[in-house]
């Protein structure tokens, strides 16, 4: 048997009341605690597996709505930074639930690495439990407030010239760049794409490549090279 768990205190931190408190108990049970238990109990690994998928969905939806013009590759880059072990560990710390983890005496979480893994898994298992008990809505309400604000997510995407250009034009002109594409087929049947990027209906850059995405990046980089250099004082977006 595990020691008494203050269900009410944990629910207050999660801002969620379980109809099946047993799910919360399971979510708090680290595999090492199960291994040292004299009686058969269920550990958190299955809930962790579920919570990982739920977290991915919630973060994907959040980014999709927050950045309506970002391409999927850039969104994936940002998502990876918001669902990794370091991020999940931070969410557990923000919720203040780490001390409730039931962990075996032989498990070392004194080191930063040990705490990172244990806390990250705890958040995912808790999220899985909330989802099973209440569905996607309370799982979303638990997760979204923990995510960093828009201005802190943007740097996660800044390696892509399209994103840098978008940040620049939004800050300077409150408009989004527009990409116009023309497909060109040569005599051998090879297709390439000619892209123009327009800002306020003015052509800022052009790109040509066999991939539409790559041509857009080339056009965006040309726009940054030309117009960004003219506005170096305002490029820190």
From Swiss-Prot:
Pfam family, one: dsrm
Example of a GO biological process term: rRNA processing
GO cellular component, one term: cytoplasm
Cytoplasm found in the keyword field: yes
Native species: Chlamydia pneumoniae
SUPFAM superfamilies for the chain: dsRNA-binding domain-like, RNase III domain-like
Subunit-level organization: Homodimer.
Protein name: Ribonuclease 3
